[in-house]
Amino acid sequence: MQALEWKDGLFYRDGSPALMISGEFHYFRVPKGDWRDRLRKWKAAGGNTVATYIPWLIHEPAEGEYSFGEHDYDDLEGFLRTCLEEGVQVVVRPGPYQYSELRYSGLPGWLCEGYPQLLARRLDGSVFGKSSISYMHPLFLEKAEKWIRKVCGLLAPWCAGRGGPIVAVQLDNEAVGIHTWFNDGWYDYNPDTFGFGNPDGRWPRFLREKYGTAEALSEAWECRVDSFADAAPLCQKAESRGGIRRLRDYEQCYLAQVSDYFALLRSWMTESGLDLPYIHNSPNPDANGDFFEIADRMGPRFLLGSDHYYNLNQNWKQNNPTPQYAVRNFISLETLRNLGVPPTVLEMPSGSASDWPPILPEDARAAYETRL
């Protein structure tokens, strides 16, 4: 097998344009005895690739105690071997985050419960999610690096360049969403991560590099700021041009730290032996623009895709695909084309965990055809 390749907005396989038709296959949820049969059914249906999360909480149930192959449900290498034997490509998603409706969004409970200082915060310092972690918190990076190096060292022999089935690796999962979804659309304001009040903190450094002087910052924000360390983010609707600039400044600072986070993840994975293209799934059709800086920084072997759901529960705006949904998808895919990558949907629904609203064949077909 060959690692995932693309150019001029198309995927290639063996030198010719090809589609990557991937289905989500969670080895930790499917009985091991059914793996081969399910893979064969997927190939018979036209699939050529499967993607799987590799949940941190399953493989490191206690801090420092790893389990790979101790049980049928955590036999990662057994799954990769079966995929190789069946000729199915694999996209691996080792995290640190997985989501996938797992407890703690796929992070270990010992991490989220045992180290509350890692949790993302509102501007007032309160916690808004029991599994919403502050990406660049030093202690989280220490724990995450150990996990990434452990799992990627195990994955390395299974990369396509070494004769294995793995053709790409995903960095984290739906970045930004773990904060905005649970903080009413706002970001993470963990003081240890962003260094509020610290002249050398991330946020004051960002402002210093952008404005140069407190006077220039005061003029832009249309309010008096005595020093960069004293400059506080705005976390409410802006009522003036200065307020809008203040909101935008924090958004840029926040997204820059996501870019730093991705760069760290990639360096750990590469140093652990993963010679593969890297991908990421923006959390919804409207979020691709948040990743422009990241895509530029990651370079030509980075593929940004998007997640397109029309319904996950009764609280969504629509129960079925709508014209508005189709327009959002079109704009999302055109954004990816403008980035020079194949317009790729990395998650879309083919079933539902809810009895109501049901996903019907007509709805599924309409949803899928909005990507054509």
Where are the regions that the model predicts?
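Catalytic-core region of carbohydrate-active enzymes that cleave or remodel glycosidic bonds
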Residues: A263-Y278, F292-L372
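Aromatic-lined substrate-binding rim segments of carbohydrate-active enzymes
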Residues: W35-Y115, A156, L265-S272
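N-terminal carbohydrate-binding accessory modules
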Residues: M1-T49
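Hydrophobic faces of well-ordered beta-strands that scaffold small-molecule active sites
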Residues: L19-G23, V50-T52, V90-P94, V167-L171, ...
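Acidic (Asp/Glu)-rich catalytic clusters
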Residues: L39-G46, L84-E85, C159, I294-G299, ...
